[in-house]
Every structure is written in structure tokens, then in C-alpha cells.
Amino acid sequence: MAKEFILGIDLGTTNSVVSVIENGTPKILENPNGKRTTPSVVAFKNGETIIGESAKRQLESNKDSVASIKRLMGTSQTVHLNNKDYKPEEISAMILSYMKDYADKKLGQPVKKAVITVPAYFDNAQREATKNAGIIAGLDVVRIINEPTAAALAFGLNKDKNENQKILVFDLGGGTFDVSLLEMESGTFEVLATAGDNHLGGDDWDHEIVKWMVEQIKSKYNFDPTTDKMAMARLKEEAERAKITLSEQLIANISLPFLAMNENGPVNVELEITRATFESMTEHLLQRTRKPLLDVLSEAKLTWNDINEVLLVGGSTRMPAVQKLVAEVTNKKPNNSINPDEVVSVGAAIQGAILAGEIQDVLLLDVTPLTLGIVVEGDVVAPLIPRNTTIPVTKSQIFSTAVDNQTAVTIVITQGERQLARDNKILGQFNLEGIEPAPRGIPQIEVSFSIDVNGITKVTAKDKKTNKEQTITIQNTSSLSKEEVEKMVKDAEANREADQKKRHEIEVIVKAEQLSNDLEKTLKSEQAKNLGEPQKQELQKEIDEIKELINKKDIEQLEKKITEFEQKMAQAAEFLKKQQGNNNPNTNNDNPQTN
């Protein structure tokens, strides 16, 4: 009988990763492109669904594409794509489905179960939305766990289980930021405190570079790239590349040949950004990570001397400024021994192996990130479960009526740390009716909160005298009904095989169209006048051949043409760069610097 795998999935804002435990060892499953991470991007073209790298390449040029959908999870917002409104759960489900499909192929068997990670500061609605996305993708989501907790699990896999360690996890991903403090002792991982910012991540650093590039191009090249979607797509891609380069080097060169066409011909952009400039323009983002670091220490009532390890998680922690700030605040050298892009998925896979009984003597005790309570008289919140309470947990408290002869009460559930209900998030409400008339303060209403291992909450109110009770499971206010979820599961299943069959074809065609368009722009540019007529005819012939292959959907020949095409573009870019350097040898010295 084949072993039952449980997937560990890090469903990220920017990238997603899937892994399993095989023979006691974590294994990252590569996608069809041979990459260990998959961009969390979805696009539609010609009625087909495209996921990952190919979708990312057409983000700005294709209006039917979307990224960073994780930022909308748990909200009522929708995205309009392919002539249809999609809920965030549906888009996330497409990413999960894609990952499940290639995991099935890598493992040689269908996999149904998964542990999916979420930021520690995700609220109840966001967790429900994530679980629904998994269901739509055809997965049995056996557990939702916090990303920093998963990272600590991965770190502690081969550690001495009898060794007591307090671990701080600094998790800066593409779109979210968490800090968690955990204690590891005798195989038990207990979360002591957590804090963070659901709207801070590497995307924000990229955006600052894009803004800087726009201003530089306006000033130096008399062109506004914000008016050209294709140009902005290339700027965003180059911004991310520059950020990555600046994590390793002091200077990043930005080369964007044929960025666009204006009245003077092609716009060939050459810029240079230093690490100092980059760190200066993003200092305000960096400082937003400081307070959560201090908050978790205060919440756990510990000092920095009590902390044994500081783990860096998330690709954005590769930035030197981030590492420096963490070291300065904690007075400890951060541990980056585990790949920050993969550690969360590995931890999720470990949790799956624990649930499957493959890994023994390890217990994970997670916490609820925010206080849960109910509204009492005067809009005041009565807290029942304080933030950072270990879950699963059940707590009860007795309340009473506010006026004489009251026969019904409304239970309003809140989430947050403020004293008044209006300053917190309202998760839901329900009525308990049939209370026997009595003077105010006499009836006894028992309110119970129960949070399960996935962080999902159930609230019950019971009249102690009549035994009448009402229960509500706190759902995402924008969550899908059971019927909607079932329909989406069927839709996803029905389209999965067809999408899988055509995905590769679409990816190749999209890339061919993009390259063909780039070369056509080159032929129409002023600098094309430097080419002889035979060269122009040769290039036009290649464009025509590619278009013909696209119409025929001859994928094999298209792939060969694309390879040749990319080589020609690289040669053209190098030629133009040298030509520009010869004509303007002092260009690099004229770039303004930001102090």
C-alpha cells in the first residue's frame, strides 16, 4: 500500500512552496519549470488559466492577471478577471490546485491532505478563507498553522528534544510580516507571543524602487512610464531584480532597452542604484518592523538575554538592512542557516508528518493572535480569551440581562485589544431568545468561546435556567456558503485536466507573442535605420514565421524559435549598450544620488 503523504504548503503573497516528509527527511517539490518556489500569480488567456512564472511575466500587459491575492483573503473584495468576478478564495484555490497537480506527479500518486500556513496575525476570517481555498482546490486541509510556528518546527526537527530553547522568529515575506516567540522543550513547541503587520512585505520595498525609477526616467529620458502598461511591467520586474542584487552587492545596474517608443524613437534606459540610496528610500518601511519585535518580548515578559535563537524567515530577510536591524534590536546574530523561502513549507510538512504519526514525540501548541470577547452594556468589551492564549482552548463566563424582564439578548463577538467595541473588529453576532422574564441581573447567561487547532472560533450562549442555547461558528464575513464551495470544487475539478493539458502550450505562446512584439518595436524604432535592408527583411521573416507557428500552435518549433529569438535580443541589447556608452561616456557619473 502506498504511503499517504500530507503536503506542507506555504501559500505566500509573492511565492508559494510545497513540500513533504519522505523517509523522515523534508523534500521540496519542484514545479514543472524545475523551480522550488512558484510565483503566486494567476492569469487568464484564451479561456485558459495560467499559474506561476508565465502568469507573472504578463502581469501588467494582461488585464486578466492578478498577484498578491493573499492581501485580500478574508475580505469581501473581488477581482474582475476573464469577464467574471472572483473571490480571493477562488484565486488562491487555483494556485493550490496547480501545486497539488505537480506534487501528485512528483510523488507518483494523488495526494489529498495538506497543512497550509498563514501569517500569525491572520484573523478568523482570513483563516477560514484559506481553508476554503484548500477545499476548492480538492484538498483536505487537516491543519492551518502559523508561518513562524512552522519555521520553528523546521529549525527544531533535528535538535535535542530535551534542550530548552526560546526562539524568536522574524518572518518578513512578500506581503506580510510576523514576529513570534516560541519555547521548545521536551519536544513541545509552545508559542509564547506573536505580533506583526499583515500589510508589510517585500512588495513594498519593490514599490519604492519602482517609484524611484519612474522619477529617474521622467527626468533623464523625458518619458512617463506610468502611461505604458508594458513599460510598468518591466519596471516592476526590474525593481525586484535590483532589490535582490542589492542584497549581495553595493550597486545594481538597471538596463531596460526598448522600454517604449516616444516621439524621439526608442527609450533605452540605463540607471544605477546604490544600496545606500535603496536603504534610505525604504527606511520608513524598515522601522515598521521594530515595534512588533519589542512587543513580543514585552508580551512574553522576557529579556533579550532569555532568547537563544533568532530565526530569519521569508525572502525579504535577505536584505542587509533588515538583518542589521534585527541584530541591533535583539543584540544577537540572526540565524539564517535554513533557506528563508522554504523553511515555512518544510515546517508545514513536518506538522503533516506529526499528524500522520510519522514523526513522534513532537507537540505543537499555537496561540490566538488577538483577544476575543463580547460586547456588554455601554459598548464595552468583556474579554474571554486574551491574545496569545494557547490553542485549542475553551473558556466560559456568566453574564446577565441589562434591563428588567428582558427575554432575549444579542451576543456580539469582537476581536482586538481595545476597550470599546467600536474600536475592534466585529466578527459576528446572534440572538439568544426565550429567557424567562426577571429583574435585570438575575438571569444567568453562560457564554462559551471555543477555538480549535486551526484557530477557528465557535461561540455558544446558554440560559442556565431554561437550558435554551444558541451557537455560532465565526465565519469569514465574505466566506463562501457550503453550496458555493461545493460548486467551486466541482468547477475546479472539471477544468483541472483541461487546464493542465493546455498550460504548457499557453505559456509558450504567450512568451512567443511578447518576444515578437519586442522585435516589431525594434524594427519600427529610429535605431533600426542603422540596419541594412537585408537585415530588416531577415528579422521581419522571423517575426512572420513565429506568428505562423503561433497560429498553428506548433509548440516544439516555437520553443526553438524562442531560444534563437532571445539570443538575438541579448545581442541587440549589448550592441545598443556599447553604442550608447561610446556616444555618452560620462552617463554613469550623472545619476543623481539620494542621501
Curated annotation (Swiss-Prot):
Q: Which family does it belong to?
A: Belongs to the heat shock protein 70 family.
Compositional bias (Low complexity): 582-595
Q: Which GO terms describe its molecular function?
A: ATP binding; ATP-dependent protein folding chaperone; unfolded protein binding
Recorded hits in InterPro entries, A to Z, give:
ATPase_NBD, Chaperone_DnaK, Heat_shock_70_CS, HSP70_C_sf, HSP70_peptide-bd_sf, Hsp_70_fam
One Pfam family from the record: HSP70
**Where Phosphothreonine occurs along the chain?**
176
Query: Which of UniProt's keywords are assigned here?
Result: ATP-binding, Chaperone, Nucleotide-binding, Phosphoprotein, Stress response
Q: Does the keyword Acyltransferase apply?
A: no
Q: What does this protein do?
A: Acts as a chaperone.
Q: Does the keyword Chaperone apply?
A: yes
Annotated protein name in UniProt: Chaperone protein DnaK
- Disordered: region residues: 573-595
- State what induces this protein: By stress conditions e.g. heat shock.
